[in-house]
Amino acid sequence: MVHRQLPETVLLLLVSSTIFSLEPKRIPFQLWMNRESLQLLKPLPSSSVQQCLAHRKNFLLPQQPVSPHQYQEGQVLAVVHEILQQIFTLLQTHGTMGIWEENHIEKVLAALHRQLEYVESLGGLNAAQKSGGSSAQNLRLQIKAYFRRIHDYLENQRYSSCAWIIVQTEIHRCMFFVFRFTTWLSRQDPDP
């Protein structure tokens, strides 16, 4: 099935190429939107999506404060970390109940764990998490609430295949949110 391999491949290719490009000295990110990743981000087969249209839900991904320009670099890293952590927790908690095989989920979790460790190793993350401005802290709380709604949705839908297809789409949306922040980070001037 297409949707069994898509999340792992998207997470591995897109997140790895973007997040692993981060360096403490802010070396520009690799070009993450390459031809292969664009192919992988094609929509699910229309038959799968059409079958699940009745299950759609707006999880209210925070859209208003998504401009990274209003945050400092450490705060942006904290937001990226929060999103990756929430995706990791979602898949770790509920992934084996979904449409993917257990070994497949383990690979995705391992990749996400590496990403999280790398982001945590970057300077500025811990300080930003402790001191973060109110707008960055507010965004992190909105992200947590967003993922809580996803958790609740899966539970209410009893982890059905359609619910997982909807959640898979949401994970893709989250990754684009991450890329918006990481693209901004890559454009910052390197330290002298």
UniProtKB/Swiss-Prot annotation:
Pfam families: Interferon. Residues 1-21 form the signal peptide. Expressed at very high levels in uterus and, at much lower levels, in ovary and cervix. Very low levels, if any, in other organs. In the endometrium, expressed in the luminal and glandular epithelial cells (at protein level). It is found in: Secreted. Disulfide bonds join C52-C162. The keyword Nucleotide-binding does not apply. GO terms for molecular function: cytokine activity; cytokine receptor binding. The keyword Secreted applies. PROSITE patterns: INTERFERON_A_B_D. Disruption phenotype: Mutant females are substantially more susceptible to (and less able to clear) an ascending infection in the reproductive tract than wild-type animals. InterPro entries: 4_helix_cytokine-like_core, Interferon_alpha/beta/delta. GO terms for biological process: defense response to bacterium; defense response to virus. Type I interferon required for maintaining basal levels of IFN-regulated genes, including 2'-5'-oligoadenylate synthetase, IRF7 and ISG15, in the female reproductive tract. Directly mediates protection against viral, including HSV-2, and bacterial, including Chlamydia muridarum, genital infections. This is Interferon epsilon. It comes from Mus musculus. The lineage of its organism: Eukaryota, Metazoa, Chordata, Craniata, Vertebrata.
